[in-house]
Each structure stands twice: as C-alpha cells, then as structure tokens.
C-alpha cells in the first residue's frame, strides 16, 4: 500500500482510455454474525485505437495506462488482504488467546490501510473535480473559439459573395469585351473589303493610266506627223514661191523683151499702148499672185493654228487627266497605307484584348480556387473544433462516470469499515469473530459492469499558396513531398528556396533547392527522402540530409523563397474522438 503522504493522483485532463469496471460480490461468513456481503471492485481498461494517436501523444497514453494498472494492482492487493484478514479471523476462532494478539495487529494494520485508501480516493475525487472544472473552462474557450471562427467564416462567406459578384461583373466585362472584339473584327473585315476595292480601283486606274499614256504617245506621234506635214507644206510653199520667182523672172524677161520690141516700135501710140497693156498684165498677175499667196498663207496659218490649238488642248487635257490620276493614285496609296496601319493597330489591340481576356480568366480561376480553399479550410477547422468539443464532452462524461464510480466504491468501503444500523462493519465483525466460533457462509452471484469504448482519430489537411507554386502532396510517413507549378506558361525559378517541415513543434527538417533549379509550367517535382527514391532531375530530387521528412500528429510543411518569404504551406493535424456504448 502506498504512503498517503507521497501519493500523487494519476487523473489528468482528457485521458484517452475507457474504464471497464468488474464488480464481484462474495459472502464471507463470520461467527455469530449472520449473512455478510463483501463487494470487491476490480478495474480493467480497454482502448481500441481506430487510427493515429491522441493529440497528447503515445507517451501520455502509456503513462495513464501505467497509472491505472498500478491502481488496479493496489485495489486487487487491498481485496486480497481483506480476504486474508477474514481467513485469519476464521483461523483465530479456534485459538482465542492467540487471536486476541493477532486481532490487535490486524486492527492496526487494517485501519491504517483503509485510511490510506480513503485519503487516496479523496485525492482522486479532488483531482477529478479540478479536471472537470478545467475541462469546463476548455469547453468555454472552445465555444469562444468556435464563435470567432464562425465570424471569420461569415466574413469569408461575404468575401466569397463579393468574389461571386466580382466574377459576375468580370463576366459582364468579358461579354462587353467580346462584343467590342466582334465589332473590331467586323470593322477589320470591312476595312479588308475596302482595301480590296481600293486595290481594284488602283488596278483600274493603272490600266486607265496605261491607256492614257498610250493615247498620249499616239497624239505625240500624230503631232510629229502634223509637224512633218507642216514642214512639208512649208517646203511646198517655198517651192511655190521659188516657182513664182522663176515665173516672175520669166515674166520680167518677157517684159523686157516686150519693152525692147516696144522700143523698136517708133510710134508713141504703140509704145503707150503696149506699156499700158504690160502694166495691166503685170498688175493682174501681181494681184492674182497676191490673192493666191494670201489665200494659201491664211489657209496654212489657220490650219496650223487650229492643229496646234487642238494638240495643245488635247495635251493639256491629257496632262490634267494624268495629274488627276496621279493625285488619285497618291490619295489611294496614302489611304491604303493609313488603312494598313489602322489594321495593324486594330490587330494589336485585338491581341491585347485577347491577352487581357485570358489573364482575367486565369485570375478569376485562381481567385475562385483560393476562396474555395479558404472556405474548405475554415469548414474543416469548424468541424475539427466541433469534434474536439464533442470529444471533450465525452471525456467530461467519462470523468463524471469515474467520479460516480469512485463515490460508490468509497461508500462501499465506508460501509465495510463502519457498517450501518442493520449490519455490522469489519471492525464489529472482527470483535464478534473473537467471541464466537460459529461460521455461516452464503455465496451470492457475481455482478459485472463493463464500459466499452473506442478511440478514433481523424487526420485533416490544409493547403495554401501565395503564388504559382503550391505543395500538392505530402507523404504522412515522411517519404516524399510533391510541389506543383500551377501556371500554364510561366516558369518558376526555385533556386536556393527552402522546404521546411516541423514535426509536433519540436523537430525541424530543411531541404534547399539547387541554385539553378527551375520548375516548368504545369509541372511537378517529387522530393524523396534519402533511400526512398532515385533522383531524376528535374522531375525527381532526393534529400540527402535525412532518410525521412518526419511523421507526427501535428506536421507543418512550409516553402520559403530565397528572400525568406513564406510562399506555400501544408498543414497536417490529427484529432481523436472517443465513443462509448
């Protein structure tokens, strides 16, 4: 039996065990005492773990089991000693004198032992009461925490609703951008058709220009022909003038002959007559010549002027048309260049709008995943707190049951020691045994009360990321860690990044990426602990610093960049639930 001064209670908060109480009743008859029922209480403990350990670890569970085994042995020893006392009383019935001496020893030893048991159970009751109070405080704190988490959940729901509204607005904006894009595409098609029409017009103008150039060449050839004809006519005029001069010289020669003949004529009348006739003939010839020359000169000058005027007019008109066509061609060229530049600008704007649309879609998907992950994490935390509250309630009920059982056992021991109005206690029983030798025995049936229970553990995971790189998967046994680049076309340099893994807030394991390591878009990298995989960069890396990343009930895996900023996290927690039947 333990010393009551050095006894320490083994009751702690949130014990992870179930109590099975076996109660057996034996009747030990005593001389001249009638029927006496002695209730011996034996405690056994059963604990079936569905998965994992309690949050307090295997060490706490082992300590609780050892304490309960020690208490069970102490109670069993107490029951055995009580039985030996009764046997000794029966043996001392035949030897009254010897029994008197032994009775004094037994009374001293028995009274001391029962006093120790009483002190121990009172300490157990006090400890259990304190544990119940602490559990109640923990329950109140858990309720407050649940209220805070509910507020956070409401805030996240509001943010999610705002995100949904923003998503709807983004969809409207996307629709507007699609309408604008359609209008731009229609305008581009219209401009392409206009450019085609203008190119056809340019081709037509080029043909017309070629035709006008050919016409100009033809007119120039005609002008050359007319010039040659004019020169020919001028040559003809010169020839005619020479003929006239020749005829004039002939006429003058003939006139001189006539004058000579007239000079030979001696009569004045004949000379006057011939002279007059000659003058008249000369005058007529000169007048006729002047008329002929004037007519030819006027006709030639008028015809030349008309032809020159027609050629000049036609040339001016053709030059004006050519200049007009050139201006038109220049205008069309400038318009085509302007349309091409506008087409290039619209094409660039179209590409920019498509890029913005794609970025908005990616951002919308990332925001939606982030909000869904945050809501899932908060729901998981709420469920976990509710499960912990339920487990606390179950443990509180177990403590209350334990307290009631201990109260019942104390009442039994008090009744065994003190007795009641109808029955005698052990003290009176021993006194009567000394004075009588009659022994009556009666055996009652044994009763048993079993409390069965089962512990079930639940593991929850929580992930978060502040960029494109996230922790996709972590082995619960600590064999590997998988990272993923969620971006579709952007590479992520992970040179000198650190992957830290904290085990139950104590042990810390750090893996550092190579300085030139790059994680490609939509790719994963699997990092094995030493001895668990073969290196195959860049898809598979091996951590040579340890043969495991560690395992435990509360594990944090955190990814830091080369500046020490936290970029991604992965939380693993285990919660235990106790069920009784």
Swiss-Prot record:
Stored SUPFAM superfamilies: Intermediate filament protein, coiled coil region, Lamin A/C globular tail domain
Region (Coil 2): 277-424
Region (Coil 1A): 75-106
Entry's Gene Ontology cellular component terms: cytoplasm; intermediate filament; nuclear envelope; nuclear lamina
Compartmental location: Cytoplasm
Tissue: Expressed in the embryonic and larval hypodermis. Also expressed in the ventral nerve cord of larvae.
Residue ranges of the region described as Disordered: 1-33
Record's keyword terms, sorted: Coiled coil, Cytoplasm, Intermediate filament
Region described as Coil 1B: spans on this chain: 121-258
Coiled coil: none
Ranges where the IF rod domain occurs: 71-424
Keyword Nucleus part of the UniProt annotation: no
Positions of region (Head): 1-74
Composition skew (Polar residues), residue ranges: 7-33
GO biological process terms, semicolon-separated: heterochromatin formation; nuclear envelope organization; nuclear migration; nuclear pore localization; protein localization to nuclear envelope
Residues covered by region (Linker 12): 259-276
Linker 1: annotated segments: 107-120
Signal peptide limits: none
Domain LTD: 457-574
Gene Ontology MF terms in the entry: structural constituent of cytoskeleton
Chain spans, region Tail: 425-578
Family from the record: Belongs to the intermediate filament family.
Complex and partners: Forms some heteromeric filaments with ifb-1.
Function summary: Cytoplasmic intermediate filaments provide mechanical strength to cells. Essential protein, involved in attachment structures in epidermal cells that connect muscles to the external cuticle. Required for epidermal morphogenesis in embryos. Probable component of embryonic epidermal attachment structures.
PANTHER family: INTERMEDIATE FILAMENT PROTEIN IFA-2-RELATED, LAMIN DM0-RELATED
UniProt protein name: Intermediate filament protein ifa-3
Lineage, top ranks: Eukaryota, Metazoa, Ecdysozoa, Nematoda, Chromadorea
This protein's encoding gene: ifa-3
């Amino acid at each position: 039996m333990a010393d009551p001064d050095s006894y320490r209670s083994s009751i702690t908060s949130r014990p992870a065990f179930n109590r099975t109480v076996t109660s057996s009743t034996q009747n030990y008859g005593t001389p001249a005492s009638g029927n006496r029922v002695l209730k011996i209480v034996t405690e056994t403990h059963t604990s079936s773990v569905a998965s994992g350990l309690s949050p307090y670890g295997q060490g706490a569970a082992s300590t609780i089991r050892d304490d309960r085994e020690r208490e069970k042995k102490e109670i069993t020893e107490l029951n055995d000693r009580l039985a030996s006392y009764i046997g000794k009383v029966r043996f001392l019935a035949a030897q009254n004198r010897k029994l008197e001496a032994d009775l004094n020893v037994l009374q001293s030893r028995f009274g001391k032992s029962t006093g120790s048991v009483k002190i121990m159970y009172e300490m157990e009751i006090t400890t259990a009461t304190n544990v119940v109070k602490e559990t109640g405080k923990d329950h109140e704190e858990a309720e407050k925490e649940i209220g805070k988490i509910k507020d956070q959940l409401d805030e996240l729901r509001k943010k999610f609703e705002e995100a949904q509204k923003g998503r709807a607005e983004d969809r409207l904006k996307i629709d507007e951008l699609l309408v604008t894009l359609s209008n731009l595409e229609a305008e581009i098609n219209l401009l392409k058709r206009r450019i085609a029409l203008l190119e056809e017009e340019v081709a037509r103008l080029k043909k017309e220009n070629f035709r006008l150039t050919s016409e100009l060449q033809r007119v120039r050839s005609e002008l050359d022909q007319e010039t040659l004809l004019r020169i020919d006519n001028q040559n003809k005029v010169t020839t005619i003038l020479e003929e006239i001069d020749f005829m004039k010289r002939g006429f003058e020669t003939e006139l001189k002959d006539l004058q000579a003949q007239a000079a030979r004529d001696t009569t004045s009348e004949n000379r006057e007559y011939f002279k007059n006739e000659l003058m008249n003939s000369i005058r007529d010839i000169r007048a006729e010549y002047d008329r002929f020359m004037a007519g030819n000169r006027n006709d030639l000058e008028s015809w030349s002027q008309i032809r020159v005027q027609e050629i000049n007019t036609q040339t001016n008109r053709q030059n004006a048309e050519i200049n007009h066509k050139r201006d038109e061609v220049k205008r069309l060229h400038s318009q085509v260049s302007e349309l091409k530049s506008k087409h290039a600008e619209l094409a660039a704007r179209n590409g920019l709008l498509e890029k913005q649309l794609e970025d908005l879609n990616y951002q919308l998907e990332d925001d939606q995943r982030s909000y869904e992950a945050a809501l899932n994490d908060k729901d998981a935390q709420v469920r976990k707190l509710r499960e912990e509250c339920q487990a606390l309630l179950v443990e509180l009920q177990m403590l209350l049951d334990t307290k009631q059982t201990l109260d019942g056992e104390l009442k039994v021991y008090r009744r065994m020691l003190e007795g009641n109005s109808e029955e005698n206690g052990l003290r009176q029983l021993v006194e009567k045994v000394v004075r009588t030798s009659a022994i009556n025995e009666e055996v009652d049936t044994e009763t048993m009360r079993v409390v069965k229970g089962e512990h079930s553990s639940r593991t929850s995971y929580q992930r978060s990321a502040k960029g494109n790189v996230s922790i996709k998967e972590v082995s619960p046994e600590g064999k590997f860690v998988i990272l993923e680049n969620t971006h579709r076309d952007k590479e992520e340099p992970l040179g000198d990044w650190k992957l830290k893994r904290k085990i139950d807030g104590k042990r810390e394991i750090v893996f550092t990426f190579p300085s030139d390591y790059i994680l490609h878009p939509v790719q994963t990298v699997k990092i094995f602990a030493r001895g668990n995989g073969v290196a195959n960069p860049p898809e598979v890396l091996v951590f040579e610093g340890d043969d495991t990343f560690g395992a435990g009930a509360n594990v944090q895996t955190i990814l830091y960049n080369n500046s020490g900023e936290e970029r991604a996290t992965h939380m693993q927690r285990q919660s235990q639930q106790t069920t009784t039947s």
